[in-house]
C-alpha cells in the first residue's frame, strides 16, 4: 500500500487556499477569477482557476481521449453526464487534471491539503466513468503557474486576495456565482472595493 504524506503548509505559503483576483486585475485571463493553489514553495506556485469553463463537455472529452466510445455516451452515470470541464489556466492547456476529495488514491495522486488531492492520469477519468472514483471531483484543462517569488509579489501588490478554501466552495456547481459568494464569505463589499480600486 502506498503511503501519501500530507503537504505541510509552511509560513507564508498558500497551499490549499483560494486566490481571488482584485478588481482591476491587469491580466484579463484572470479577471474575477478564483484560483485554488495546489503547490506553493520557494520554487514557485501552481493552481487552477475554478470558476471558468471550457467549451468542451466532460463526456465529449472522455470520447476525444479514447476513454469511451460514441456508443458509451448514453450509458454514462448521471454524475459523469453533468460534470463540467474548467479552464484551469493558461499553461499546458491540453493537459487534464482532477482535483478531488481524499477518498480516492492511486500512486500518482498528490495530496494538496488535509482533504483535497490532485490526480492527473487517465485512471481517475475511467473510475469516474465507471461510477466509482472520488465522491467529489472537478476536472480542469490547463493550470496557472508562477515563477519563484512571483505570486508573493503579486499578493503584496494587491493583485490577489487570499482566503481559506472550504470544500463546499471548491466543489460546488455554482461556478458563475463563486467569485461573488467568496467575497461575501470574506465580508467584502464589492461595490466599495471597485470604488477604492479606481483611486490612486
UniProtKB/Swiss-Prot annotation:
Gene3D superfamilies recorded: VC0467-like (3.40.1740.10)
GO cellular component: cytosol
Coiled coil (residue ranges): none
Domain of life per record: Bacteria
SUPFAM superfamilies documented for this protein: VC0467-like
NCBIfam families: PRK00228.1-4 (NF001268)
Similarity annotation: Belongs to the UPF0301 (AlgH) family.
HAMAP family per UniProt: UPF0301
Protein name: UPF0301 protein BCAN_A0487
Organism whose genome encodes this protein: Brucella canis (strain ATCC 23365 / NCTC 10854 / RM-666)
Amino acid at each position: 500500500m502506498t503511503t501519501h504524506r500530507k503537504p505541510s503548509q509552511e509560513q507564508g505559503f498558500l497551499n490549499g487556499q483560494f486566490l481571488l483576483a482584485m478588481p482591476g486585475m491587469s491580466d484579463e485571463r484572470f479577471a474575477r477569477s478564483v484560483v485554488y493553489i495546489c503547490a506553493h514553495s520557494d520554487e514557485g506556485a501552481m493552481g487552477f482557476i475554478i470558476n471558468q469553463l471550457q467549451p468542451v463537455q466532460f463526456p465529449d472529452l472522455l470520447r476525444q481521449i479514447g476513454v469511451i466510445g460514441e456508443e458509451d455516451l448514453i450509458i454514462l452515470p448521471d454524475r459523469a453526464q453533468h460534470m463540467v470541464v474548467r479552464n484551469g489556466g493558461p499553461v499546458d492547456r491540453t493537459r487534464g487534471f482532477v482535483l478531488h476529495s481524499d477518498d480516492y488514491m492511486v500512486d500518482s495522486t498528490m495530496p494538496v491539503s488535509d482533504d483535497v488531492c490532485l490526480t492527473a492520469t487517465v485512471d481517475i477519468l475511467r473510475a469516474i466513468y465507471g461510477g466509482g472514483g472520488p465522491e467529489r471531483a472537478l476536472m480542469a484543462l490547463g493550470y496557472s503557474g508562477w515563477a519563484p517569488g512571483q505570486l508573493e509579489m503579486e499578493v503584496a501588490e494587491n493583485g490577489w486576495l487570499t482566503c481559506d478554501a472550504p470544500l463546499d466552495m471548491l466543489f460546488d456547481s455554482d461556478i458563475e456565482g463563486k467569485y461573488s459568494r467568496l467575497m461575501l464569505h470574506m465580508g467584502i463589499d464589492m461595490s466599495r472595493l471597485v470604488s477604492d480600486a479606481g483611486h490612486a
